Every structure is written in structure tokens, then in C-alpha cells.
């Protein structure tokens, strides 16, 4: 048994361990993909950080832009108000001088207009929508009565400016533009209405001129009688110039 054991010991050669194929958890090239993905993730994080920084920088600039827009609107509104006030002052100078009461009323009216415009500007800047619409802006005519009320409000709105030198040109342009969409028959009606108004105005003007002329004209026969009286004064006796004048006549 000892020999067998020694033989076994001499002839025994330890088997080389079978090299197992290297176990790869990942396919070839996946490690590289992971590296690329890691790089992508890093890039995305950097981009997000940059976007956040841009947003934080953009917020104050947006606020600045909004404040600038508000200032621009305020300046524009003030310019319009100043131009309107100058125009009203010029028109007032051309017209009959105002009484102290009229001047005070005009100042109050201009002040009210300025306050209203400032209020509307503030509402627009803060996004406030006013539902308390009144007057002509609240009218949406559909029936005949609605248009009658609309007509009254329009006249009240426009009539205060009838003394302006620009009033007639304003009406001419306004009527022309408003009548562009009308049919021929409707235009004829408007034309006839204005023609009647023109004839009535011309008749009144002639009547007024006739009254002025009559004040300087003597009644019928007055000139002849006056000439006879003058000749009689110069004749001084019966059968003088007055008689000659009668014979001549």
C-alpha cells in the first residue's frame, strides 16, 4: 500500500486550475458608455446651473424693463396731456375772453381729465381691469332707442369743441369715414338732410342781411319828399324852387 501510495504521490500532478473566462458584468464598450453618460450628466448639470444663473439674472432685468415701460407710458401720457392743454389754451385765446368762473371751471375740467388719465395709467400698469364702465363707453346700441341714447351721448361728447377752428374739418373727415360703408340710397338720405339744413341756413343769413340794409334805407317816397322840403327851404316863397320842382316833376 505504501508503494501504491508513493506511486500515486509521484505520478500525481496537480491539475492546473481551469482558467475561467473572465466574467464581464458589462458588454464590451459599456464602460466607455458609462463614462460618456457621466460626462453627459455633468454637462447637463452645468447647463442647468447656467440656466438658473441666467434666470436669476433675467429677473431683475425683466423688472427693469417693466419699470421702464411704465415710465415710457407715463411720459407719453404727460406729453399728450400737455399738448391737449396747450391746444385748449390757444383755442381759448382765439375765442371770447373767459370770465373768472369759466376759467375756474376749465381748470377743474383739465385737472379732472389728468386725474382720470393717471388713474387709468396706474390700472394698466398693475393689470387692474375696471368693470365700472359708464357713459358712452358702456353703450352697445342695438335697438332704435339705444341708438337715440347713443346719439345724445355723442353730441354731449363732441359739442363742447364746436368753437375750435378744427371742428368743421373734423366733422367733414368723420362723416366721410363713417359713410364709406353705406349704400347709395342711405347716402342720398344723408345728403338730402344736409342740403335742407344748408338751405335753411342760407335763408336765415339772407334775412339777417336784409334787416341790416333796411335800417339805412328810407321808406318808399321818402327821398322825393325830402328833396321837396329842401327846395322849399331854399325858395323862401310860394312859387319858388318848390313850385319849379313840382312843375318839373
UniProtKB/Swiss-Prot annotation:
<comment type="subunit">
    <text>Component of the eukaryotic translation initiation factor 3 (eIF-3) complex, which is composed of 13 subunits: eif3a, eif3b, eif3c, eif3d, eif3e, eif3f, eif3g, eif3h, eif3i, eif3j, eif3k, eif3l and eif3m.</text>
</comment>
<keyword id="KW-0648">Protein biosynthesis</keyword>
<dbReference type="InterPro" id="IPR013906">
    <property type="entry name" value="eIF3j"/>
</dbReference>
<keyword id="KW-0963">Cytoplasm</keyword>
<dbReference type="InterPro" id="IPR023194">
    <property type="entry name" value="eIF3-like_dom_sf"/>
</dbReference>
<keyword id="KW-0396">Initiation factor</keyword>
<dbReference type="Pfam" id="PF08597">
    <property type="entry name" value="eIF3_subunit"/>
</dbReference>
<feature type="region of interest" description="Disordered">
    <location>
        <begin position="1"/>
        <end position="104"/>
    </location>
</feature>
<dbReference type="GO" id="GO:0003743">
    <property type="term" value="F:translation initiation factor activity"/>
</dbReference>
<dbReference type="GO" id="GO:0016282">
    <property type="term" value="C:eukaryotic 43S preinitiation complex"/>
</dbReference>
<feature type="compositionally biased region" description="Acidic residues">
    <location>
        <begin position="1"/>
        <end position="15"/>
    </location>
</feature>
<feature type="coiled-coil region">
    <location>
        <begin position="34"/>
        <end position="96"/>
    </location>
</feature>
<dbReference type="GO" id="GO:0001732">
    <property type="term" value="P:formation of cytoplasmic translation initiation complex"/>
</dbReference>
<feature type="compositionally biased region" description="Acidic residues">
    <location>
        <begin position="28"/>
        <end position="52"/>
    </location>
</feature>
<dbReference type="GO" id="GO:0005852">
    <property type="term" value="C:eukaryotic translation initiation factor 3 complex"/>
</dbReference>
<comment type="similarity">
    <text>Belongs to the eIF-3 subunit J family.</text>
</comment>
<keyword id="KW-0597">Phosphoprotein</keyword>
<comment type="function">
    <text>Component of the eukaryotic translation initiation factor 3 (eIF-3) complex, which is involved in protein synthesis of a specialized repertoire of mRNAs and, together with other initiation factors, stimulates binding of mRNA and methionyl-tRNAi to the 40S ribosome. The eIF-3 complex specifically targets and initiates translation of a subset of mRNAs involved in cell proliferation.</text>
</comment>
<protein>
    <recommendedName>
        <fullName>Eukaryotic translation initiation factor 3 subunit J-A</fullName>
    </recommendedName>
</protein>
<feature type="compositionally biased region" description="Basic and acidic residues">
    <location>
        <begin position="53"/>
        <end position="96"/>
    </location>
</feature>
<feature type="compositionally biased region" description="Basic and acidic residues">
    <location>
        <begin position="16"/>
        <end position="27"/>
    </location>
</feature>
<keyword id="KW-0175">Coiled coil</keyword>
<dbReference type="GO" id="GO:0033290">
    <property type="term" value="C:eukaryotic 48S preinitiation complex"/>
</dbReference>
Amino acid at each position: 500500500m505504501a508503494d501504491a501510495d508513493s506511486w500515486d504521490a509521484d505520478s500525481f500532478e496537480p491539475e492546473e486550475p481551469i482558467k475561467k473566462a473572465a466574467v464581464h458584468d458589462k458588454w464590451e464598450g459599456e464602460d466607455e458608455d458609462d463614462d460618456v453618460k457621466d460626462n453627459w450628466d455633468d454637462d447637463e448639470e452645468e447647463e442647468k446651473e447656467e440656466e438658473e444663473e441666467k434666470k436669476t439674472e433675467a429677473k431683475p432685468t425683466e423688472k427693469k424693463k417693466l419699470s421702464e415701460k411704465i415710465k415710457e407710458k407715463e411720459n407719453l401720457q404727460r406729453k399728450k396731456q400737455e399738448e391737449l392743454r396747450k391746444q385748449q389754451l390757444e383755442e381759448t385765446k382765439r375765442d371770447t375772453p373767459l370770465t373768472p368762473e369759466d376759467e375756474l371751471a376749465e381748470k377743474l375740467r383739465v385737472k379732472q381729465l389728468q386725474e382720470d388719465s393717471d388713474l387709468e395709467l396706474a390700472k394698466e400698469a398693475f393689470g387692474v381691469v375696471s368693470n365700472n364702465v359708464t357713459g358712452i363707453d358702456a353703450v352697445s346700441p342695438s335697438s332704435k332707442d339705444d341708438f337715440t341714447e347713443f346719439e345724445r351721448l355723442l353730441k354731449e361728447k363732441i359739442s363742447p369743441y364746436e368753437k375750435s377752428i378744427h371742428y368743421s374739418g373734423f366733422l367733414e373727415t368723420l362723416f366721410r369715414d363713417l359713410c364709406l360703408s353705406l349704400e347709395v340710397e342711405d347716402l342720398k338720405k344723408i345728403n338730402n338732410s344736409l342740403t335742407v339744413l344748408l338751405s335753411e341756413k342760407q335763408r336765415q343769413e339772407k334775412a339777417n342781411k336784409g334787416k341790416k340794409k333796411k335800417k339805412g334805407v328810407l321808406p318808399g317816397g321818402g327821398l322825393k319828399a325830402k328833396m321837396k322840403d329842401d327846395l322849399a327851404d331854399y325858395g323862401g316863397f310860394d312859387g319858388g324852387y318848390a313850385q319849379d320842382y313840382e312843375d318839373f316833376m
